[in-house]
Amino acid sequence: MKITGIKAWKVGLPLKEGRYNWSNGNFVEVFDSTVVAVETDAGITGYAECCPLGSAYLPAYAHGVRAGLEEIGPKVIGLDPTDLNVLNRHMDSVLRGHPYVKAPIDIACWDILGKVSGLPVYKLLGGAAQEKVALYRAISQEAPEAMARKIAGYKAEGYTKFQLKVGGDADQDIDRIRVTREILDATDTLVADANTGWTRAEAARIAAEVGDLDVYIEQPCPTYEECLSVRARTARPFVLDEVIDGVGTLMKALADDAMDIINLKISKVGGLTKARLMRDICVASGTPMTIEDTWGGDIVTATIAHLARSTPEEFSFSATDFNSYGTVDIAKGAPKRVNGFMTASDAPGLGIEPIFEVLGEPVVVIG
Protein backbone atom coordinates (compact mmCIF):
# COMPACT_ATOMS: atom_id res chain seq x y z
CA MET A 1 0.00 0.00 0.00
CA LYS A 2 1.26 3.48 -0.88
CA ILE A 3 0.22 7.02 -0.10
CA THR A 4 -1.09 8.62 -3.29
CA GLY A 5 -2.50 11.93 -2.14
CA ILE A 6 -3.14 14.36 0.70
CA LYS A 7 -6.01 16.80 1.02
CA ALA A 8 -6.78 19.40 3.66
CA TRP A 9 -9.86 21.42 4.52
CA LYS A 10 -10.08 24.60 6.57
CA VAL A 11 -13.01 24.73 8.99
CA GLY A 12 -14.05 27.29 11.59
CA LEU A 13 -15.09 26.08 15.03
CA PRO A 14 -17.15 28.74 16.88
CA LEU A 15 -17.49 28.35 20.64
CA LYS A 16 -20.70 27.83 22.59
CA GLU A 17 -19.42 30.28 25.21
CA GLY A 18 -18.46 32.77 22.51
CA ARG A 19 -14.87 33.24 23.62
CA TYR A 20 -12.01 31.35 25.29
CA ASN A 21 -9.56 33.39 27.39
CA TRP A 22 -6.26 32.34 28.90
CA SER A 23 -3.10 33.94 30.28
CA ASN A 24 -1.60 37.26 29.20
CA GLY A 25 -4.84 38.46 27.62
CA ASN A 26 -4.89 35.80 24.90
CA PHE A 27 -8.24 34.69 23.52
CA VAL A 28 -9.92 32.91 20.61
CA GLU A 29 -13.52 33.28 19.42
CA VAL A 30 -13.50 30.97 16.37
CA PHE A 31 -10.89 28.24 16.16
CA ASP A 32 -9.26 27.62 12.77
CA SER A 33 -9.00 23.86 12.35
CA THR A 34 -7.54 21.76 9.53
CA VAL A 35 -9.00 18.39 8.55
CA VAL A 36 -6.56 16.17 6.67
CA ALA A 37 -7.12 13.15 4.42
CA VAL A 38 -4.35 10.72 3.47
CA GLU A 39 -5.33 8.74 0.36
CA THR A 40 -3.87 5.39 -0.75
CA ASP A 41 -3.66 3.23 -3.85
CA ALA A 42 -5.78 0.64 -2.03
CA GLY A 43 -8.75 2.98 -1.97
CA ILE A 44 -8.52 3.40 1.80
CA THR A 45 -8.41 6.95 3.17
CA GLY A 46 -7.42 8.01 6.66
CA TYR A 47 -8.52 11.21 8.36
CA ALA A 48 -7.12 13.48 11.04
CA GLU A 49 -7.48 17.01 12.40
CA CYS A 50 -5.09 19.63 13.74
CA CYS A 51 -6.19 22.81 15.53
CA PRO A 52 -3.56 25.01 17.22
CA LEU A 53 -4.66 27.14 20.18
CA GLY A 54 -4.17 30.43 18.38
CA SER A 55 -0.59 31.51 17.71
CA ALA A 56 0.51 32.49 21.24
CA TYR A 57 0.29 29.14 23.02
CA LEU A 58 2.95 27.01 21.30
CA PRO A 59 5.28 27.52 18.30
CA ALA A 60 2.35 26.64 16.03
CA TYR A 61 -0.40 28.47 14.18
CA ALA A 62 -3.38 27.47 12.08
CA HIS A 63 -2.14 28.70 8.69
CA GLY A 64 1.14 26.93 9.44
CA VAL A 65 -0.58 23.54 9.41
CA ARG A 66 -1.66 23.98 5.81
CA ALA A 67 1.57 25.66 4.69
CA GLY A 68 3.51 22.82 6.30
CA LEU A 69 1.40 20.21 4.54
CA GLU A 70 2.21 21.88 1.21
CA GLU A 71 5.90 21.49 2.09
CA ILE A 72 5.98 17.96 3.50
CA GLY A 73 3.04 16.40 1.66
CA PRO A 74 4.80 15.70 -1.65
CA LYS A 75 7.66 14.07 0.27
CA VAL A 76 5.48 11.34 1.80
CA ILE A 77 3.80 10.33 -1.47
CA GLY A 78 4.79 6.74 -2.23
CA LEU A 79 5.41 5.73 1.39
CA ASP A 80 3.53 2.88 3.04
CA PRO A 81 1.11 4.48 5.53
CA THR A 82 1.12 1.39 7.72
CA ASP A 83 4.88 1.58 8.32
CA LEU A 84 4.41 4.22 10.98
CA ASN A 85 7.92 4.39 12.42
CA VAL A 86 9.40 4.52 8.92
CA LEU A 87 6.96 7.28 8.01
CA ASN A 88 7.84 9.32 11.10
CA ARG A 89 11.58 8.99 10.60
CA HIS A 90 11.14 10.11 7.01
CA MET A 91 9.04 13.13 7.97
CA ASP A 92 11.67 14.14 10.54
CA SER A 93 14.40 13.81 7.93
CA VAL A 94 12.71 16.02 5.33
CA LEU A 95 11.23 18.69 7.65
CA ARG A 96 13.03 19.65 10.83
CA GLY A 97 10.70 20.54 13.69
CA HIS A 98 7.07 21.51 13.07
CA PRO A 99 5.61 18.48 14.88
CA TYR A 100 2.08 19.87 14.62
CA VAL A 101 2.34 19.71 10.81
CA LYS A 102 3.41 16.06 10.89
CA ALA A 103 0.80 15.06 13.47
CA PRO A 104 -2.27 14.89 11.20
CA ILE A 105 -0.37 12.83 8.62
CA ASP A 106 0.69 10.39 11.33
CA ILE A 107 -2.81 10.23 12.85
CA ALA A 108 -4.49 9.70 9.47
CA CYS A 109 -2.11 6.80 8.87
CA TRP A 110 -3.16 5.24 12.20
CA ASP A 111 -6.74 5.56 10.92
CA ILE A 112 -5.66 3.74 7.76
CA LEU A 113 -3.91 1.01 9.77
CA GLY A 114 -7.06 0.47 11.79
CA LYS A 115 -9.20 0.23 8.67
CA VAL A 116 -6.77 -2.21 7.03
CA SER A 117 -6.62 -4.43 10.11
CA GLY A 118 -10.30 -4.08 11.00
CA LEU A 119 -9.40 -2.85 14.48
CA PRO A 120 -10.11 0.36 16.38
CA VAL A 121 -7.04 2.51 16.94
CA TYR A 122 -7.15 1.99 20.72
CA LYS A 123 -6.55 -1.74 20.13
CA LEU A 124 -3.47 -0.91 18.05
CA LEU A 125 -2.21 1.47 20.76
CA GLY A 126 -2.29 -1.22 23.43
CA GLY A 127 -5.87 -2.32 23.98
CA ALA A 128 -8.78 -1.30 26.16
CA ALA A 129 -6.95 -0.40 29.36
CA GLN A 130 -10.11 1.40 30.52
CA GLU A 131 -13.67 1.41 29.20
CA LYS A 132 -14.43 5.06 29.81
CA VAL A 133 -12.18 8.09 30.15
CA ALA A 134 -12.60 10.79 32.81
CA LEU A 135 -12.82 14.31 31.38
CA TYR A 136 -11.91 17.73 32.68
CA ARG A 137 -13.53 21.03 31.78
CA ALA A 138 -11.40 24.07 30.99
CA ILE A 139 -12.77 27.24 32.57
CA SER A 140 -12.02 30.33 30.50
CA GLN A 141 -10.35 33.18 32.41
CA GLU A 142 -12.86 35.66 33.82
CA ALA A 143 -13.65 37.30 37.15
CA PRO A 144 -13.46 34.80 40.05
CA GLU A 145 -17.21 34.69 40.68
CA ALA A 146 -18.00 34.18 36.99
CA MET A 147 -15.58 31.25 36.82
CA ALA A 148 -17.15 29.74 39.93
CA ARG A 149 -20.61 29.97 38.35
CA LYS A 150 -19.36 28.18 35.24
CA ILE A 151 -17.81 25.42 37.32
CA ALA A 152 -21.12 24.95 39.15
CA GLY A 153 -22.90 24.61 35.82
CA TYR A 154 -20.44 22.10 34.39
CA LYS A 155 -20.41 20.17 37.65
CA ALA A 156 -24.15 19.70 37.21
CA GLU A 157 -23.39 18.14 33.79
CA GLY A 158 -21.23 15.46 35.42
CA TYR A 159 -17.70 16.89 35.35
CA THR A 160 -15.60 16.40 38.49
CA LYS A 161 -12.29 17.73 37.13
CA PHE A 162 -11.73 21.39 36.29
CA GLN A 163 -8.83 23.30 34.78
CA LEU A 164 -8.91 26.94 35.84
CA LYS A 165 -7.34 29.41 33.41
CA VAL A 166 -5.19 31.71 35.53
CA GLY A 167 -2.00 33.56 34.62
CA GLY A 168 -3.28 37.10 35.02
CA ASP A 169 -3.14 39.49 37.95
CA ALA A 170 -1.63 37.60 40.90
CA ASP A 171 -4.16 38.79 43.47
CA GLN A 172 -7.06 37.96 41.16
CA ASP A 173 -5.57 34.55 40.46
CA ILE A 174 -5.40 33.82 44.19
CA ASP A 175 -9.08 34.79 44.43
CA ARG A 176 -9.92 32.67 41.37
CA ILE A 177 -8.38 29.60 42.98
CA ARG A 178 -9.95 30.17 46.41
CA VAL A 179 -13.46 31.02 45.19
CA THR A 180 -13.65 28.06 42.82
CA ARG A 181 -12.18 25.55 45.27
CA GLU A 182 -14.81 26.54 47.83
CA ILE A 183 -17.72 25.41 45.65
CA LEU A 184 -16.20 22.01 44.80
CA ASP A 185 -16.59 18.75 46.69
CA ALA A 186 -13.58 17.22 48.40
CA THR A 187 -13.44 14.53 45.71
CA ASP A 188 -13.39 17.06 42.84
CA THR A 189 -10.13 18.00 41.13
CA LEU A 190 -9.00 21.59 40.54
CA VAL A 191 -6.01 22.52 38.38
CA ALA A 192 -4.77 26.13 38.24
CA ASP A 193 -3.24 26.39 34.77
CA ALA A 194 -1.20 29.57 34.27
CA ASN A 195 -0.16 28.68 30.70
CA THR A 196 3.28 30.27 31.32
CA GLY A 197 1.60 33.50 32.49
CA TRP A 198 3.37 34.04 35.82
CA THR A 199 6.85 35.28 36.60
CA ARG A 200 8.82 33.08 38.94
CA ALA A 201 8.19 35.53 41.80
CA GLU A 202 4.45 35.62 41.12
CA ALA A 203 4.25 31.85 40.89
CA ALA A 204 6.13 31.38 44.17
CA ARG A 205 3.84 33.86 45.92
CA ILE A 206 0.61 32.39 44.52
CA ALA A 207 1.65 28.81 45.30
CA ALA A 208 2.38 29.86 48.89
CA GLU A 209 -0.93 31.73 49.23
CA VAL A 210 -2.96 28.69 48.11
CA GLY A 211 -0.76 26.17 49.88
CA ASP A 212 -3.61 25.19 52.20
CA LEU A 213 -5.88 24.21 49.30
CA ASP A 214 -6.26 21.01 47.30
CA VAL A 215 -5.14 22.43 43.95
CA TYR A 216 -2.69 21.41 41.24
CA ILE A 217 -0.33 24.03 39.78
CA GLU A 218 0.17 23.74 36.01
CA GLN A 219 2.90 25.33 33.86
CA PRO A 220 3.37 28.50 35.94
CA CYS A 221 6.25 30.04 33.97
CA PRO A 222 7.56 30.12 30.38
CA THR A 223 10.80 28.17 30.86
CA TYR A 224 11.60 24.75 32.24
CA GLU A 225 14.15 26.22 34.64
CA GLU A 226 11.66 28.71 36.09
CA CYS A 227 9.08 25.96 36.57
CA LEU A 228 11.65 23.74 38.25
CA SER A 229 12.44 26.58 40.68
CA VAL A 230 8.75 26.98 41.57
CA ARG A 231 8.33 23.23 41.89
CA ALA A 232 11.06 23.16 44.55
CA ARG A 233 9.21 25.77 46.64
CA THR A 234 5.72 24.28 46.81
CA ALA A 235 4.14 21.13 48.13
CA ARG A 236 1.23 21.47 45.69
CA PRO A 237 1.15 18.73 43.01
CA PHE A 238 2.75 20.02 39.84
CA VAL A 239 1.84 19.67 36.15
CA LEU A 240 4.06 20.51 33.18
CA ASP A 241 2.68 21.10 29.70
CA GLU A 242 4.22 23.58 27.27
CA VAL A 243 7.84 22.68 28.09
CA ILE A 244 7.29 18.92 27.64
CA ASP A 245 7.37 18.75 23.86
CA GLY A 246 9.07 15.43 23.15
CA VAL A 247 10.83 12.39 24.54
CA GLY A 248 13.99 14.36 25.34
CA THR A 249 12.28 16.95 27.53
CA LEU A 250 10.16 14.26 29.16
CA MET A 251 13.22 12.19 30.10
CA LYS A 252 14.99 15.24 31.51
CA ALA A 253 11.93 16.23 33.53
CA LEU A 254 11.61 12.72 34.94
CA ALA A 255 15.28 12.70 35.92
CA ASP A 256 14.90 16.12 37.59
CA ASP A 257 11.66 15.18 39.39
CA ALA A 258 10.23 18.28 37.73
CA MET A 259 6.53 17.35 37.89
CA ASP A 260 3.95 14.90 39.18
CA ILE A 261 1.83 14.90 36.00
CA ILE A 262 2.39 15.86 32.38
CA ASN A 263 -0.06 17.28 29.90
CA LEU A 264 0.43 15.14 26.79
CA LYS A 265 -0.94 16.96 23.76
CA ILE A 266 -0.91 14.74 20.68
CA SER A 267 -0.16 17.34 18.00
CA LYS A 268 2.42 19.08 20.21
CA VAL A 269 4.64 15.99 20.06
CA GLY A 270 4.00 15.02 16.42
CA GLY A 271 1.08 12.60 16.43
CA LEU A 272 -0.01 9.28 17.90
CA THR A 273 3.24 7.42 17.21
CA LYS A 274 5.31 9.73 19.39
CA ALA A 275 2.51 10.32 21.88
CA ARG A 276 2.22 6.56 22.40
CA LEU A 277 5.95 6.34 23.10
CA MET A 278 5.75 9.18 25.63
CA ARG A 279 2.63 7.62 27.16
CA ASP A 280 4.44 4.32 27.64
CA ILE A 281 7.45 6.05 29.21
CA CYS A 282 5.10 7.83 31.62
CA VAL A 283 3.37 4.58 32.56
CA ALA A 284 6.72 2.84 33.09
CA SER A 285 7.91 5.71 35.30
CA GLY A 286 4.67 6.02 37.28
CA THR A 287 3.69 9.43 35.90
CA PRO A 288 0.01 10.19 35.25
CA MET A 289 -1.04 12.22 32.21
CA THR A 290 -3.71 14.52 30.97
CA ILE A 291 -4.19 13.18 27.44
CA GLU A 292 -5.51 15.76 25.02
CA ASP A 293 -4.53 18.20 22.29
CA THR A 294 -4.26 21.94 21.73
CA TRP A 295 -7.86 22.22 20.46
CA GLY A 296 -10.11 20.74 17.82
CA GLY A 297 -13.47 19.26 16.97
CA ASP A 298 -14.87 15.77 16.46
CA ILE A 299 -11.78 14.18 14.89
CA VAL A 300 -9.35 15.52 17.49
CA THR A 301 -11.72 14.33 20.22
CA ALA A 302 -11.84 10.85 18.69
CA THR A 303 -8.04 10.73 18.52
CA ILE A 304 -7.76 11.71 22.18
CA ALA A 305 -10.32 9.08 23.15
CA HIS A 306 -8.36 6.27 21.48
CA LEU A 307 -5.05 7.15 23.14
CA ALA A 308 -6.73 7.68 26.51
CA ARG A 309 -8.77 4.47 26.35
CA SER A 310 -5.57 2.51 25.76
CA THR A 311 -3.94 4.10 28.84
CA PRO A 312 -4.29 2.48 32.30
CA GLU A 313 -6.84 4.34 34.41
CA GLU A 314 -4.40 5.09 37.23
CA PHE A 315 -2.16 6.96 34.77
CA SER A 316 -5.01 8.72 32.95
CA PHE A 317 -5.40 11.87 35.04
CA SER A 318 -7.94 13.36 32.63
CA ALA A 319 -8.76 14.00 28.98
CA THR A 320 -10.76 16.53 26.96
CA ASP A 321 -13.94 16.37 24.89
CA PHE A 322 -13.22 19.38 22.69
CA ASN A 323 -16.20 18.69 20.45
CA SER A 324 -18.53 19.67 23.30
CA TYR A 325 -17.04 23.20 23.41
CA GLY A 326 -18.00 24.08 19.84
CA THR A 327 -21.17 24.63 17.84
CA VAL A 328 -20.18 22.79 14.64
CA ASP A 329 -20.10 19.02 14.03
CA ILE A 330 -17.47 18.05 11.45
CA ALA A 331 -17.55 14.23 11.64
CA LYS A 332 -19.95 11.39 12.34
CA GLY A 333 -19.08 8.76 14.93
CA ALA A 334 -17.18 11.04 17.31
CA PRO A 335 -17.26 10.42 21.07
CA LYS A 336 -19.98 12.10 23.10
CA ARG A 337 -19.67 12.97 26.77
CA VAL A 338 -21.83 11.08 29.27
CA ASN A 339 -21.72 12.22 32.90
CA GLY A 340 -18.16 13.52 32.69
CA PHE A 341 -16.76 10.57 30.72
CA MET A 342 -16.28 9.54 27.09
CA THR A 343 -15.06 6.44 25.31
CA ALA A 344 -13.51 5.54 21.96
CA SER A 345 -15.39 3.90 19.11
CA ASP A 346 -15.07 0.16 18.51
CA ALA A 347 -15.27 0.71 14.74
CA PRO A 348 -12.11 0.19 12.65
CA GLY A 349 -9.65 3.08 12.69
CA LEU A 350 -10.70 6.23 14.51
CA GLY A 351 -14.33 5.34 13.87
CA ILE A 352 -15.24 8.70 12.34
CA GLU A 353 -16.38 9.92 8.94
CA PRO A 354 -15.99 13.60 8.00
CA ILE A 355 -19.13 15.54 7.12
CA PHE A 356 -18.01 16.89 3.76
CA GLU A 357 -21.04 19.14 3.41
CA VAL A 358 -19.65 21.07 6.39
CA LEU A 359 -16.02 20.97 5.25
CA GLY A 360 -16.67 22.26 1.73
CA GLU A 361 -13.91 22.17 -0.87
CA PRO A 362 -10.33 21.25 0.10
CA VAL A 363 -7.84 24.10 0.32
CA VAL A 364 -4.80 21.82 -0.10
CA VAL A 365 -4.61 19.07 -2.74
CA ILE A 366 -1.38 17.10 -3.16
CA GLY A 367 -0.86 14.16 -5.49
UniProtKB/Swiss-Prot annotation:
It comes from the Bacteria. SMART domains: MR_MLE. Its EC number is 4.2.1.171. GO terms for molecular function: hydro-lyase activity; metal ion binding. It catalyses: cis-3-hydroxy-L-proline = 1-pyrroline-2-carboxylate + H2O. GO terms for biological process: alpha-amino acid metabolic process. Mg(2+) binds at D193, E218, D241. Keywords: Lyase, Magnesium, Metal-binding. The active site is at K165 (proton donor/acceptor), K265 (proton donor/acceptor). The keyword Amino-acid biosynthesis does not apply. Its cofactor is Mg(2+). PANTHER family: D-GALACTONATE DEHYDRATASE-RELATED, ENOLASE SUPERFAMILY MEMBER DDB_G0284701. Catalyzes the dehydration of cis-3-hydroxy-L-proline (c3LHyp) to Delta(1)-pyrroline-2-carboxylate (Pyr2C). May be involved in a degradation pathway that converts c3LHyp to L-proline, which would allow S.novella to grow on c3LHyp as a sole carbon source. This is Cis-3-hydroxy-L-proline dehydratase. It comes from Ancylobacter novellus (strain ATCC 8093 / DSM 506 / JCM 20403 / CCM 1077 / IAM 12100 / NBRC 12443 / NCIMB 10456). The lineage of its organism: Bacteria, Pseudomonadati, Pseudomonadota, Alphaproteobacteria, Hyphomicrobiales.
